[in-house]
Curated annotation (Swiss-Prot):
Its main location: cytoplasm. Changing residue 912 to S: Abolishes deglutamylase activity. Widely expressed. Highly expressed in the cerebellum and cortex of adult mouse brain. Expressed at similar levels in both the cerebellum and the cortex throughout all developmental stages. Also expressed in sciatic nerve transection, spinal motor neurons undergoing axon regeneration, testis, heart, eye, lung, pancreas, intestine, stomach, pituitary, spleen, adrenal, kidney and in developing brain. Expression in cranial motor nuclei is the same as that observed in uninjured primary motor neurons. The modification Phosphoserine is found at residue 1160. Changing residue 982 to L: Decreased tubulin deglutamylation. Transmembrane segments: none annotated. The keyword tRNA processing does not apply. PROSITE patterns: PEPTIDASE_M14. It catalyses: (L-glutamyl)(n+1)-gamma-L-glutamyl-L-glutamyl-[protein] + H2O = (L-glutamyl)(n)-gamma-L-glutamyl-L-glutamyl-[protein] + L-glutamate; C-terminal L-alpha-aminoacyl-L-glutamyl-L-glutamyl-[tubulin] + H2O = C-terminal L-alpha-aminoacyl-L-glutamyl-[tubulin] + L-glutamate. Its EC number is 3.4.17.-, 3.4.17.24. This is Cytosolic carboxypeptidase 1. Induction: By axonal regeneration. It comes from Mus musculus.
Length: 1218
């Protein structure tokens, strides 16, 4: 205790001493004659400031007057020693404690007083060196904390004082060093920088810097930093170029690089590079850099630095300079418009499509004439630091602030008479079911009867695809109609050598007789064309695979027993339908025990609640449906993945860890194209714009194809022996949206690392930088009973490239560049046929096949299922409308009344063709709704589902990414859809308007989407209160009364769906989204629970699937979980107590509880939710990235208050039902 008391007394004494000395100094200020006393007092304060942190803290604490006293004394005293003492005190104060104390000194007026002191001291002849050194030192420290420092210094005339000191005392390094530090601070003001340049500061800097020297390295470092800041001025940069200083900088850099063997002067070498980076911001600087052989110099020096990790800043800066100076290249295309043309029935008056049609034919829309004339923005080096602020500013500006616009109000649309055209699509509202064979003829309580099922009729290839299926009557499925028989097949002239498939990562043992057969089989399967139909080998092949392969097929016997096949060996495929699990019985031995164990031991992915219906894939049926699908290119081929089908792989696929240095390695290889031009092949191997082009037949060249449904690949150029540049096609009637890809590759060799570069991407960022991989499908693997898409590729990165993007394609902005997705693949099989896709493909024909299979297999006594035609698309394809609910228990009034009064759920998907994950989620929803599970039956009895599973069939068919054939984003047309240009949106909105007109407003509307920039699954909804809250108008948000029911469904899903993340949800209404389905259905139709459900293209960073890439299993599970969430929502929102048999209630609760046990708490996810890599990800070479439109949808990652997290009062009263 005594020791603590002594310490306390000592601290109190020291504190009191400083306060006393400051009080004494304040009194002395009024008497200018007591200079000796002021000198003594300031020396005592200096001693305390140098020795005790507590003293320094006492003088800079809020409320302390110590700083004012010191500054007042400094301003008024004439005594030199007192001035030096106070300057030393100020240096002690600002040299510790971080920037807070410097800001404190600025807030007390220190900048102005010190600048005035500098001016007064400069009038002495000669100026006192110590005063100048200390004053410049303090100003260099506090200047960056004063936003108006540059203006103050210029107005006071301090610029000339500091510059003259450097000129006059060139050899006095002690004085020159703080002067250079202050010049660097002056130069942050562009006007000051130009003024200093006119007075010879650039020439002065080049006198100070020089070749390698062990002396005065500190001065060299500061001089280079100052020079780099000065050269950010275009005027100064031009002056440096005119005097040949670019060559000087390169020479100095090479000299320091050669002599700095121990890398002790890395900061000096980086300072030289920073000066080069500044001077190459202008076109003249870049030209001078190229002329001085700068590309080769920096390339060679950076390659020599790769072995030393501490030199990474030099490598990264060198890479940035080289990318910036790399000559802008023209994308090797005749036009940026799509290779395919579709004539619209009417041309819009305004908008991008109108501009596209009005563009004169002589205008080059690929690149601007003066694309490289504009100098680069001076703030480019702050691009990464400012990106988040720019995004946040954009989002805040995009938030709707007009309360009147936010309030839902039904807009007068079509009249009742006009809406009557949709009556035939709602027969469930008027049907009395007198002609149906229902389960019961008497009203009685519902009793679930397990798996009672009706007849299942699987359509075959001989059936015609029905265009409009009515309701099922008398418990019998719709009658079949024969389709025209196919034409005779023609021999495929493009046979390629194929070897037997090998298992990924392992070898397969092949029977001698099987080898030649399977080799011929894959060789013959070079193309599946719609003209090939059964003819010559009908006795040996399954109907789904009966093609004229152009060669005889040898009858084989299976060398291994297959327990899952009843009869095997006499033919290639058994049975009427192709079952992919039986493809091992082609004469190929099944995998050996070790290989089998390696697959089976792989950790299994969590299972989805499976429907008990039959498989939905039927190759035979798929071919017949494709024949009726209308595409603009008139596709005649079928991709193998769509034909064979896809099943989720039985193993998990983790998010890929990014190797260190992969981006700079790829960029260095791109730069080598300019340095070593003789190594570049530059040969076109695939060209959609040249109909007469034939694929080269060289054995070492890959062959490409995308002429099938949903395919997108426009041109391929072979760069090196195993490197290819790929160019994607624009959306039809558009000149951009290059993101979705789906193409075929063949002719590969195992053991070769093939690099693929997709070089005309447009988005400024991608999940490919954060662990996402493209998808690959191997035909050899499918024949080996592994028919699945898998994540494939290494060394994946996404970065800005040197291909120029024209202002026509960039919305009027000049100087934009494209981005590259690059990935490397090692193929395991020789001469395989492989497919690559941006995400799991799901074609329009696949949807039609799935719907037909669901219709054929459902139990008509239990499930009410209708597949109607909503409308025809621009190209004449039908847009299906599906109605699903439970059949009434009987045709008695009570049951019919209950049937008709069920609330509606309206679902839609795939308005954006490239978001294929939306279709997989919809598939999960449809399969669940059609299943025989108890909760599915309960769900059907609770709601009537109206579903438009594909809002943009034409876009999906033709391989578009975002638009329909009208060249417009259909999800921006909901406010005023044109019936001729946007028929699917026009009629989907008409359905909703009809429901509103007949007072049957849907309880929930949800549009399924995919998100390319974020992880997990999440929802966007609409809320007035949360939108106003994000405008920071708290008073206005407090006055708004709003039902919080819109949060209920997302919160339910966050508990039961492992991929769903509540913290990523947003309920803010943005101006840029006012014409989307979510906002229009909420605002105009009046549906409170109007959502967009976004599914990641990449994977999850929370919950059960944390660290895993998402697959079709997880997407379909999300669709099923969405249905379970709707059932729980029913119990929370029902006006009457909703009781179920206890066994059903327990069943659902068990399902929910099991999901909750394995779901970790969600994390708050920001727009850029990824941690930084050890290697800084640099997406661009020079200019600020354009703000991605999609980022606007991220607005409002909202952290709700406790009250808003709770359910509404009406919901809380019913929580006992859960």
């Amino acid at each position: 205790m005594s020791k603590l008391k002594v310490v306390g007394e000592k601290s109190l004494t020291n504190s009191s001493r400083v306060v006393g000395l400051l009080a004494q100094l304040e009194k002395i200020n009024t008497d200018s004659t007591e200079s000796d006393t002021a000198r003594y007092v300031t020396s005592k304060i200096l001693h305390l400031a140098q020795s005790q942190e507590k003293t320094r803290r006492e003088m800079t604490t809020k409320g302390s007057t110590g700083m004012e006293v010191l500054l007042s004394t400094l301003e008024n005293t004439k005594d030199l020693q007192t001035v030096l003492n106070i300057l030393s005190i100020l240096i002690e104060l600002v040299s510790s404690g971080g920037g807070r104390r410097a800001s404190f000194l600025v807030a007390k007026g220190g900048s102005q007083i010190l600048l005035q002191l500098l001016m007064n001291a400069s009038k002495d002849s000669p100026p006192h060196e110590e005063v100048m050194v200390q004053t410049h030192s303090i100003l260099a420290k506090i200047g960056p904390k004063d936003k108006k420092f540059g203006v103050k210094a210029r107005v006071n005339g301090a610029l000339t004082v500091t510059l003259n000191l450097v000129k006059q005392h060139f050899q006095n390094y002690r004085l020159v060093l703080p002067c250079l530090q202050l010049l660097r601070v002056y130069s942050t003001n562009s006007v000051n920088s130009v003024s200093l340049g006119k007075n010879g500061v650039v020439e002065l800097m080049f006198k100070i810097i020089g070749p390698f020297s062990k002396k005065n390295s500190g001065l060299m470092k500061v001089a280079l930093d100052t020079l780099a800041a000065l050269l950010k001025s275009k005027t100064n940069a031009r002056r440096a170029v005119d005097r040949g200083y670019v060559q000087v900088l390169l020479t100095i850099y090479v000299d320091w690089h050669r002599h700095d063997n121990r890398h002790r002067n890395m900061l000096i070498r980086k300072g030289i590079l920073q000066s080069l980076k500044s001077v190459t911001n202008i076109k003249l600087g870049r030209k001078a850099f190229i002329d001085a052989n700068g590309m080769k110099i920096l390339y060679n020096t950076s390659q020599e630095c790769l072995a030393v990790r501490t030199l990474d800043p030099l490598v990264n800066t060198s890479s940035l300079i080289m990318r910036k100076c790399f000559p802008k290249n023209r994308l090797p295309l005749p036009t940026i418009k799509s290779s395919f043309h579709f004539q619209l029935p009417i041309i819009p008056v305004t908008g991008p499509v109108a501009q596209l049609y009005s563009l004169p034919p002589e205008v080059d829309d690929v690149v601007d004439e003066s694309d490289d004339n504009d100098d680069i923005d001076l703030e480019v080096e702050n691009e990464l630091e400012n990106e988040d602020d720019l995004d946040q500013s954009f989002k805040n500006d995009d938030i709707e602030t007009d309360i009147n616009k936010l309030r839902p109000q039904q807009v007068p649309g079509r009249t009742i008479e006009e809406l009557k055209m949709y009556e035939h699509l709602f027969p469930e509202l008027v049907d009395d079911f007198q002609d149906y064979e229902l389960i019961s003829k008497e009203p009685k309580p519902f009793v679930f009867e397990g798996k009672a099922r009706g007849p299942i009729v699987v359509p075959t290839a001989g059936e015609e695809v029905p265009g409009n299926s009515g309701s099922v009557k008398k418990g019998v499925v719709m009658k079949e109609r024969a389709s025209p028989k196919g034409e005779e097949a023609k021999e495929d002239p493009k046979g390629h050598d194929r070897t037997l498939p090998q298992q990924l990562g392992g070898q397969s043992r092949v029977a001698p007789s099987a080898h030649s057969f399977n080799n011929d089989l894959v060789k013959a399967l070079d193309r599946i064309t719609l003209q090939n139909v059964p003819s010559q080998v009908a006795s040996g092949l399954n109907a789904g695979m009966r093609k004229d392969f152009g060669l005889p097929l040898t009858v084989l016997s299976c060398t291994k027993a297959c327990p899952h096949v009843a009869k095997c060996g006499s033919t290639l495929f058994e049975g009427r339908t192709v079952h992919l699990g039986k493809l091992c019985c082609t004469g190929v031995e099944t995998e050996d025990d070790e290989d089998t164990e390696s697959h089976s031991s792989t950790e299994q992915a969590p299972s989805v609640e499976a429907s008990d219906g039959p498989t939905l894939h039927d190759p035979d049926l798929y071919i017949e449906i494709v024949k009726n699908t209308k595409s603009v290119p008139e596709y005649s081929e079928v991709a193998y993945p769509d034909y064979f089908g896809h099943i989720p792989p039985p193993f998990k696929e983790p998010i890929l860890e990014r190797p260190y240095g992969v981006q700079r390695t790829k960029i260095a290889q791109d730069i080598e194209r300019l340095i070593h031009q003789n190594d570049i092949i530059d040969r076109v191997v695939y060209d959609l714009d040249n109909p007469t082009y034939t694929t080269p037949e060289e054995g070492d060249t890959l062959k490409f194809n995308s002429k099938f449904e949903s395919g997108n690949l426009r041109k391929v150029i072979q760069i090196r022996k195993s490197e290819y540049d790929l160019i994607l096609n624009s959306d039809i009637n558009s000149n951009h949206y290059h993101q979705w890809f789906y193409f075929e590759v063949s002719g590969m060799r195992p053991g070769v690392a093939y690099r693929f570069n997709i070089i005309n991407c447009e988005k400024s960022n991608s999940q490919f930088n954060y662990g996402m991989q493209p998808l690959m499908y191997s035909v050899q693997e499918a024949l080996n009973a592994r028919p699945w898409w898998i994540r494939m590729g290494t060394d994946i990165c996404y970065y800005k490239n040197h291909f120029s993007r024209s202002s026509v394609a960039a919305g009027g902005q000049k100087g934009k560049s494209y981005y590259t997705i690059t990935f490397t693949v090692n193929f395991p099989h020789k001469d395989d046929v492989c497919y690559f896709a941006y995400h799991y493909p799901y074609t329009y024909s696949t949807l039609q096949m799935h719907l037909q299979k669901l219709e054929s297999a459902h139990n008509p006594q239990q499930i009410y299922f209708r597949k109607d035609v909503l409308c025809e698309t621009l190209s004449g394809n039908i847009c299906p409308l599906v109605t699903i609910t439970a059949m009434p228990e009987s045709n008695y009034y009570e049951h019919i009344c209950q049937f008709r009064t069920r609330p509606y759920i309206f679902l839609s998907a795939r308005v954006h063709p490239g978001e294929t994950n939306a279709s997989w989620v919809m598939k999960g929803t449809l399969e669940y709704l059609m299943s025989n599970s108890p909760t599915a039956q309960s769900l059907r009895e609770s709601y009537i589902f109206k579903i438009v599973p594909m809002l943009n069939p034409d876009g999906v068919i033709n391989g578009n990414h975002r638009c329909s054939l009208s060249g417009e984003d259909l999800n921006r047309q909901w406010q005023s859809p044109n019936p001729e240009l946007h028929p699917t949106i026009y009629h989907a909105k008409g359905l909703l308007q009809y429901l509103a007109a007949v007072k049957r407003l849907p309880l929930v509307y949800c549009d399924y989407h995919g998100h390319s920039r974020k992880k997990n699954v999440f929802m966007y909804g609409c809320s007035i209160k949360e939108t106003v809250w994000h405008t920071h108008d708290n008073s206005a948000s407090c006055d708004i009364v709003e039902d919080m029911g819109y949060r209920t469904l997302p919160k339910i899903l966050s508990h039961i769906a492992p991929a769903f993340c509540m913290s990523s949800c947003s309920f803010v209404v943005e101006k840029s989204k006012e014409s989307t389905a979510r906002v229009v259905v909420w605002r105009e139709i009046g549906v409170q629970r109007s959502y967009t459900m976004e599914s990641t293209l990449c994977g999850c960073d929370q919950g059960r699937y944390k660290g895993l890439q998402i697959g079709t299993r997880e997407l379909e599970e999300m669709g099923a979980k969405f249905c379970v969430g709707l059932l729980r929502l029913k119990r929370l929102t029902s006006s009457l107590e909703y009781n179920l048999p206890s066994n059903l209630l327990d069943f659902e609760n068990d399902l929910i509880e099991s999901s909750c046990k394995v779901t970790s708490p969600t994390t708050y996810v920001l727009d850029e939710d990824e941690p930084r890599f050890l290697e800084e990800v640099d997406y661009s070479a020079e200019s600020n990235d354009e703000l991605d439109v999609e980022l606007a949808e991220n607005t409002g990652d909202y952290e709700p208050s406790a009250q808003e997290e709770a359910l509404s009062d009406s919901e809380v009263s019913r929580t006992h039902l859960i």
